[in-house]
Amino acid sequence: MQALNHFSRIRLSWFLLLLCIIFFEASALTFQHIMKLPPCVMCIYERVAMMGIGGAAIIGLLNPNNLIIRWCGFIAWGISAGWGLKLALEHVDFQLNPSPFSTCDLFVTFPSWAPLNKWAPWMFEAYGDCSKIVWQFLTLTMPQWLVIIFAGNLIALAIFVIAQFFNKK
């Protein structure tokens, strides 16, 4: 655990987290623009949650040896991964239990101070159906993979948070 504590205090750990998020975001854009799979509202919200983890990685990169900055990164990571997991589970439910009484919104809704779909519609505009399964890999749908990814992030975060209490004396 001391090794993980030390690893969380160097920029490499936060940079690796950021690289993973860049990979996932690039994958999402590849699905959208190269494979022509239309993103739905939940896909866009899950994309924003993933970017939140990227933001947490950037916070940690600033000065991971500083206790306050490192914990701000952990908190942002946890909030973003938790929100992403909630969204992905809801998205899986839309796909596996389609119902006319339980559907996702028709349009993305962002705050007026951050209308991401207006600023970058190529990345944040949704025009797909949340309940439609458009892609599978190893029998899992995209939202099911996102459940694994966000849950994996929460597990990794928990391990790093626990490691914070194992200091060299």
UniProtKB/Swiss-Prot annotation:
GO CC terms, sorted: plasma membrane
Residues exposed to the Periplasmic side: 31-48, 90-144
Disulfide bonds listed in the record: 40-43, 104-130
Family: Belongs to the DsbB family.
GO molecular function per UniProt: electron transfer activity; protein-disulfide reductase activity
NCBIfam families, per database record: PRK01749.1
Location(s), subcellular: Cell inner membrane
Role: Required for disulfide bond formation in some periplasmic proteins. Acts by oxidizing the DsbA protein.
Stretches that traverse the bilayer: 14-30, 49-64, 72-89, 145-163
Record's bilayer topology term: Multi-pass membrane protein
Name this polypeptide is given: Disulfide bond formation protein B
Gene name, Swiss-Prot/TrEMBL: dsbB
UniProt record, GO biological process: protein folding
Gene3D superfamilies: DsbB-like
Keywords: Cell inner membrane, Cell membrane, Chaperone, Disulfide bond, Electron transport, Membrane, Oxidoreductase, Redox-active center, Transmembrane, Transmembrane helix, Transport
Keyword Cell inner membrane attributed: yes
Keyword Cell membrane recorded: yes
PANTHER family assigned: DISULFIDE BOND FORMATION PROTEIN B
One Pfam family this sequence matches: DsbB
Topology feature Cytoplasmic, residues: 1-13, 65-71, 164-169
